[in-house]
Structures are given as C-alpha cells and as structure tokens.
C-alpha cells in the first residue's frame, strides 16, 4: 500500500481554511442531477497496481516485437541499433524537460544542443541552414511546400510518384484548406527504376510551379540523381524540395543540397530514435540561407553578450508564431526536442567515419539480401540502384503473404497493397528494408519462408 500524504485531518484543515464544510461544497455550481453519486453501474472496482501490470504484460505478449523476429520493415521507419549511451545522455535532468528555451540566460545548454543539432543536419543535407526540428518527416514535407509558395508566390506543387503515400495524404489534407494545387501520381514497378517518374516531373514543371517534391531514396527504395531536376526547376523559377526518410543513406550517397535542392526535409527517426510505435519522431528541415526568413520552426543562433562572451539564443523569431498568425511562417509551436537531441547524440557518437561505415554495412546487407530473395522462384527484383531498401514483385498479392510470414514470427516487409489500397498493379509489391540489425541467418529465414509461401 503506497503512502498518500493526504489524511482526513489534512483534508479537514484545508476545507476549514477556505471556509467549506465538505468536499461537496466545492461543487455547488454543478447541478445535483449532473453529479456522480456512488459507483458507476457495471464498472468494476479498480485493480491493484500489481494486477494491472500483470494484465498489461499478458496483452504485450500478444505482440511480435521488432527485437524478437527477423525484421525487414521500412518504408519511412527503420530499425537501427541505438547505443545505450544515447538514452543515458538524453535522460539527464538538464535535457529531459518540456521547457522551451525562451529564456536564454537559463537555457544555454539546451540552446547549444539545438545549435549543434542544426549544424549536423545542415552538413548532412548539404544545406546552409537548418532549424531546430519539426514534428516529423510528413509535417516537415508539407511545411516545405508552403515555404515554397511563400518564396515563389506560386501555388502549384508537383509531387513525385515515389513520395511516401502518407506524406502525400497529409499534403492533400492540408491543401484542402490552403488552396494549394497538388499534382500527384502513384508509382509503378518499372524494373530498374521503380517509382522513378523523372520524365513526368521534368515535363510538368512550368511557370506556375512553386516546387517539385521528390523523395530520395524513394518509397520503393530507388536512388536517383536529382541534378537535372534541380536545374529544370531553377530554369522555370521553381524550387526543388528533396525528402529523405532514411538519413543513414547520406553516409553513402550525395546529399540533396549537393545535387541542387533548395529545401531538404526528412525524417530523422533512423538515427538515435527507436520505432516507438510510430512516434514521437523528429522532422528535419534545412534550406539555402537566402530563404531562411521563410523557413518554419525555431532557429537557435549564436551571438555575443555585452561582455563579449559567446551565447546561444532563439533567433529570427519574427518569422514564427510570436507574431500575427497570418504573418507567421509556421504555426507549429513546438518540436520533438528530446528526439532531436537523441539524433544529435547518436550522430556525434558515429562521427563521419562511423556514419559512412554504418551506411556501407546497410548497403552491403541489402545487396546480399536482394540477391538471395531474387533467387526465390517467381520473385522479381525490380530495383537497379538502391541503398538499404528494395522492392520485390511477387507472383501473387503480397499482403496475405506478409500476414502469413508474421504468423510464423517473421516481419518480412511492407506490402504495397497496404500503402496503395485499390491499386491492383501494385498489389504484388513487397518493400524489404535491410539494416545492420538483420543477420545473414535472418535473410535466409525470410528467403525460405517466402519460397514456401509462394509455392503453397
């Protein structure tokens, strides 16, 4: 029995202090008929804490957790090994707080951590400046579209067929209220370059286009060179928005900024942040310095105080929600700061060499897995260039295959039929992600199980 420091004597003293005879006197403004009198019919008495823990543990055992099975799920959320030191550092009392650092004189540590995070994101994305993070990748993507509208004074955004369908769905929802025109498409399983609609994008850019949004690697794992697309956007006065849902890939491929992207956004979950049942995650946002005043979110900057000492502050705040709503660049009024810190700590522990090595491990494992799975009779590998994720074309609908594999304790990938319901041409698509957490034995287990499923 836990000790609760509120005795009958304490309660009586408190009531006497405020001049109330009983607890009921505190609710005299609530009509008698609306007050709860006695227990609720049909609702059992509360259980003890121990009983609740046992009940929740029984429920949890019904789940198939990522660490208990060969795991090949991806499509925007990836399982990577996160060193224990990351959680240890972010749980320090100085960081584990919901406090927003509006008062720099008492928040120098938090502000410096955000400044370092921004520096890392800007370098990773090949951009001049980054903000202190957004909610997640999908909201960062939408904010990039609205930023492009402000910069170009145009309202037509062209979305690549390889953009994550959840990102597209969010953009369509928001565009209903903003009036933005979205030109979207669904991917195909063209062998060699699945989901790559570069020809469509190049042809669609015109004088009304505010931006082109392209994901790299895309939803099907295809990796593309964005240089030609960036040049065409700039020729027509539009911006190129690049989306990165797997930042580990940037340890192996050229950054979007190097390829000419004006705005780069993404999901930072795969570095430092666990799967977490889908959230909270950390949205990444970076851009060219000439557009910084139109960039949403908070910015931590460095300055000097009256004594010449270096200090960190929230800067360019007139872009944000501190001013009139209709004038603000964004009305997102917070961010997943702790997740941003986890991202920064993990990336710091890796360093440039470590990130490159991690990327090499992922790519090598994915190549080996793709070669093995393509040997399964009836299975076709549709990717040419990919990083740690690729798409298989099965001879039957992939969704029931995925469910059957899960019943056997194998999380074998993401069915495109789940992401694109009703699209028969994509029903046989299976997206497989291979990170450093997947062993050769895991791949062989998946290959044998997949072969048995297809032969059944």
From Swiss-Prot:
Sorted alphabetically, which keywords does the UniProt record give? Answer: Oxidoreductase
Cross-referenced Gene3D superfamilies, in alphabetical order? Answer: Aspartate Aminotransferase, domain 1, Type I PLP-dependent aspartate aminotransferase-like (Major domain)
GO terms for biological process, alphabetical: glycine decarboxylation via glycine cleavage system; nucleoside metabolic process
What this protein catalyses is:
N(6)-[(R)-lipoyl]-L-lysyl-[glycine-cleavage complex H protein] + glycine + H(+) = N(6)-[(R)-S(8)-aminomethyldihydrolipoyl]-L-lysyl-[glycine-cleavage complex H protein] + CO2
The UniProt entry, under CDD domains, shows: GDC-P
> What Enzyme Commission number does this protein have?
1.4.4.2
Q: Name one GO molecular function term.
A: glycine dehydrogenase (decarboxylating) activity
User: Which InterPro entries does this one have?
Assistant: GcvPA, GDC-P_N, GDC_P, PyrdxlP-dep_Trfase, PyrdxlP-dep_Trfase_major, PyrdxlP-dep_Trfase_small
Q: What family is reported?
A: Belongs to the GcvP family. N-terminal subunit subfamily.
The function of this protein is: The glycine cleavage system catalyzes the degradation of glycine. The P protein binds the alpha-amino group of glycine through its pyridoxal phosphate cofactor; CO(2) is released and the remaining methylamine moiety is then transferred to the lipoamide cofactor of the H protein.
Complexes and interactors = The glycine cleavage system is composed of four proteins: P, T, L and H. In this organism, the P 'protein' is a heterodimer of two subunits.
Concerning HAMAP family, the annotation shows:
GcvPA
* UniProt protein name: Probable glycine dehydrogenase (decarboxylating) subunit 1
